[in-house]
């Protein structure tokens, strides 16, 4: 624990100057109530009981000066988030009053909480398992409703259940094997068919859970999409139609966009950062050259590139030059201005590669956006993301540990097939148990905990 035995305090809400009607200062620890009683004056006959809200004033105990009119929420152990005594001051919003209240708490004996320390205490006291604790951070940082739902499912324990069952199965098998090692003459032989079946069933379940990792990563970090192409093919019009706003300036003059314009969208539950880039061409204009260079960098940094061309002019040498630079990226060809060509137009004639994913749009008329989103989802999900039928998903840390468990179980299968001594079976089973315990928090090092909770905000 970062501040073992001490009462911690922090501002639990975002501080935005001149915005927000309420700001919360949170205390947790054995001295939380005593500190609150030194700072808070509750008029009348209000009773300091658990899970009650008191009305009153936060005062400086040295001067008696009132700092803020506030509500106080009291939650005594173990019926609190951390399973310690927890007190919250619900102050007026803004920056000044809430910071003064926090400072008074620190002067009264509390120490400033480190990032994630409240949730760390909840984990250490058994209020949350490690998957639930990580889901708290995911819920706070969710960038889409689907990401929030996945985090909430993890917080409700839906991820821990299959993991605990897997670990129990491995422990049961290990116990059976060790019993045969220690008491071989007193017990019947191992049922190899049953053990092999249990190992195979466990591997099937591990693979099912691992299949959610890509979906989880997309939900948490989102997708970066770069719109590239030569000048005046309709890149900015595409961004505006897609974002349903005038994010980018649109004119008939080549080189209007000089810098990367960003917009944030949600496509099929996946947060998407869209980068509208400057038209790529040879130019002597120094400012435009900088914009072109940034376009190249945006394309290289993107998870997916939308190469936009003009249906009126078809495939040009400039398009080919750009395609050569981005063809190794995940790529979709967008044939824009389809409304300006006749019905005899053949989009396949514009393809530099027959296998290239393409679609047609009329961005100025807001046409083709649904097709664009469908193509993006198909591209990043391979048609349908594995594990998409589950309402939760694992993160990269959990996937790495689960992959180790999978390899260990596969080693057990190989050991059984090769009829190696039972001692060899136990080595890989213990590693599988250890790897699964790292996910649930039953076997986890202090350095892993530090890494996990360092990404939390202060006050959570």
From Swiss-Prot:
- Write out the residues that bind GTP: 232-237, 251-257, 276-279
Identify the residues that bind (6S)-5-formyl-5,6,7,8-tetrahydrofolate.
26, 88, 127, 460
Fetch the SUPFAM superfamilies from UniProt: P-loop containing nucleoside triphosphate hydrolases, TrmE connector domain
Is Hydrolase tagged as a keyword?
Answer: yes
Q: Name one Pfam family in it.
A: MnmE_helical
Query: Which EC class is the enzyme in?
Result: hydrolase
- Where in this chain does the record put each TrmE-type G domain? 222-381
Major location, coarse class?
Answer: cytoplasm
Gene Ontology CC: one annotated term: cytosol
Q: Which GO terms describe its molecular function?
A: GTP binding; GTPase activity; metal ion binding
Record text on cofactor binding: Binds 1 potassium ion per subunit.
Stretches assigned to coiled coil: none
What are the binding positions for Mg(2+) in this chain? 236, 257
NCBIfam families found in the cross-reference section: mnmE_trmE_thdF, PRK05291.1-3, small_GTP
Name it: tRNA modification GTPase MnmE
In its UniProt entry, the species of origin is given as: Cyanothece sp. (strain PCC 7425 / ATCC 29141)
């Amino acid at each position: 624990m970062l501040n073992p035995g001490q009462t911690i305090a922090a501002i639990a809400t975002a501080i935005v100057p001149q915005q927000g009607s309420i700001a919360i200062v949170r205390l947790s620890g054995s001295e939380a109530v005593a500190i609150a009683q030194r700072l808070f004056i509750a008029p009348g006959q209000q009773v300091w009981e658990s899970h009650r809200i008191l009305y009153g004033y936060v005062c400086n105990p040295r001067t008696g000066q009132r700092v803020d009119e506030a509500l106080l929420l009291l939650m005594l152990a173990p019926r609190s988030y951390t399973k310690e005594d927890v007190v919250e001051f619900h102050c007026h919003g803004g920056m000044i009053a809430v910071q003064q209240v926090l400072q008074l708490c620190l002067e009264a004996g509390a120490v400033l909480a480190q990032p994630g320390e409240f949730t760390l205490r909840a984990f250490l006291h058994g209020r949350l398992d490690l998957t639930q604790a990580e889901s708290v951070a995911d819920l706070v940082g969710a960038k889409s409703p689907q990401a929030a739902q996945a985090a909430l499912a993890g917080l409700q324990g839906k991820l821990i259940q299959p993991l605990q069952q897997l670990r129990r199965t491995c422990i049961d098998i290990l116990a059976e094997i060790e019993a045969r090692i220690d008491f071989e003459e007193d017990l019947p032989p191992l049922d190899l068919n049953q053990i092999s079946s249990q190992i195979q069933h466990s591997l099937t379940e591990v693979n099912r859970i691992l299949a959610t990792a890509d979906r989880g990563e997309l939900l948490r970090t989102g997708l970066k999409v770069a719109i590239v192409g030569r000048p005046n093919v309709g890149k900015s019009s595409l961004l505006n139609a897609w974002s349903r706003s005038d994010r980018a300036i649109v004119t008939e003059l080549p080189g209007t966009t000089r810098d990367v314009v960003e917009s944030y969208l949600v496509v099929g539950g996946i947060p998407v950062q869209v980068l509208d880039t400057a038209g790529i061409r040879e130019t002597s204009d120094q400012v435009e050259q900088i914009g072109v260079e940034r376009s190249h960098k945006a394309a290289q940094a993107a998870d997916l590139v939308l190469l936009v061309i003009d249906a009126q002019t078809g495939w040009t040498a400039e398009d080919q030059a750009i395609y050569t630079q981005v063809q190794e990226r995940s790529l979709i060809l967008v044939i824009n201005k389809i409304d300006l060509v006749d019905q005899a137009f053949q989009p396949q004639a514009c393809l530099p590669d027959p296998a290239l994913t393409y679609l047609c749009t009329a961005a100025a008329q807001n046409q083709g956006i649904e097709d664009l989103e469908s193509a993006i989802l198909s591209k990043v999900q391979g048609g349908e993301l594995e594990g998409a039928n589950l309402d939760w998903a694992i993160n990269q840390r959990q996937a790495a540990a689960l992959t180790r468990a999978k390899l260990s179980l596969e080693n057990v299968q190989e050991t059984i097939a090769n009829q190696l001594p039972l001692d060899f079976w136990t080595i890989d089973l213990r590693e599988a148990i250890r790897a699964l315990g790292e996910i649930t928090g039953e076997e986890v090092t202090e350095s892993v905990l530090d890494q996990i909770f360092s990404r939390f905000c202060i006050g959570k």
